[in-house]
């Protein structure tokens, strides 16, 4: 008698809770269905690959004083590397300092004034020497670049005879990236000569160019905010 009453109420309660929780689960599922209708857009956030020169004052005084050409070469190299490997990496001052010291130890550049002995040796250490190379000569400002060329311009400040390197577009007028932000050598000077870097991997030429344009816009926006 007791067992039959127990079984009756047990089954009754079991049916009740099954219906209750099944209903709650269905309601939850309906809520998630609503979220399924929402489309989320993936937004790419591209940060400039190399810090500005003045940010190295505490980390590496040599880079902060003399590192404009070295940083331009790294900037170009990192853009080629991220396009080639489809991996974006923003390097901080600490990482650049370690890389600088490693490249000095291998003879790629001098540690006392950041003079670059071999851009191609730097590219080899970055693993991109088959993708881009430096044409070992100085070109005049009148040089007409190929589509696959990346230009680093050597500017001379007329008022101080100070030299400074920046990355420029193929029109030789647009500054893509300036390690000093807005350097006086660019605003008060002229292009003394050009360093020409040639992309050998034809499959990445357009993507590298597009990424440099994007970084140029990012660079300009950062200057406006500052």
PLM feature spans:
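Conserved active-site-adjacent core of cysteine acyl-enzyme catalytic domains
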Residues: 3, 78-212, 217
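Short intrinsically disordered terminal tails
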Residues: 1, 223-226
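Active-site-adjacent structural segments surrounding the nucleophilic cysteine of cysteine proteases
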Residues: 1-108
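Detector for intrinsically disordered, low-structure N-terminal pre-sequences
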Residues: 37, 42-44, 195, 207, ...
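Extended hydrophobic/Leu-rich segments
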Residues: 17-18, 25, 32, 204, ...
């Amino acid at each position: 008698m007791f067992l039959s009453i127990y079984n009756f109420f047990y089954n009754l309660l079991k049916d009740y809770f099954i219906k209750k929780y099944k209903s709650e689960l269905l309601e939850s599922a309906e809520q998630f269905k609503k979220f399924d209708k929402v489309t989320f857009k993936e937004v790419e956030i591209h940060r400039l690959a190399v810090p500005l020169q003045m940010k190295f004052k505490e980390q590496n005084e040599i880079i902060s004083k003399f590192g404009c050409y070295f940083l331009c070469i790294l900037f170009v190299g990192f853009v080629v590397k991220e396009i080639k490997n489809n991996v974006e990496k923003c390097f901080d001052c600490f990482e650049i300092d370690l890389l600088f010291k490693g490249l000095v130890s291998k003879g790629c550049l001098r540690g006392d004034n950041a003079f670059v002995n071999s851009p191609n040796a730097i590219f080899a250490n970055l693993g991109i020497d088959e993708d881009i190379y430096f044409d070992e000569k100085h070109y005049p400002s009148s040089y007409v670049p190929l589509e696959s060329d990346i230009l680093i311009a050597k500017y001379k400040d007329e008022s101080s005879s100070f030299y400074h390197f920046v990355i420029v577009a193929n029109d030789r007028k647009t500054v893509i990236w300036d390690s000093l932000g807005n350097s006086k050598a660019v605003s008060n000077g002229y292009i003394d000569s050009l360093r020409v870097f040639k992309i050998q991997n034809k499959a990445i030429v357009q993507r590298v160019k597009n990424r440099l344009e994007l970084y140029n816009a990012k660079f300009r926006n950062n200057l406006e905010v500052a």
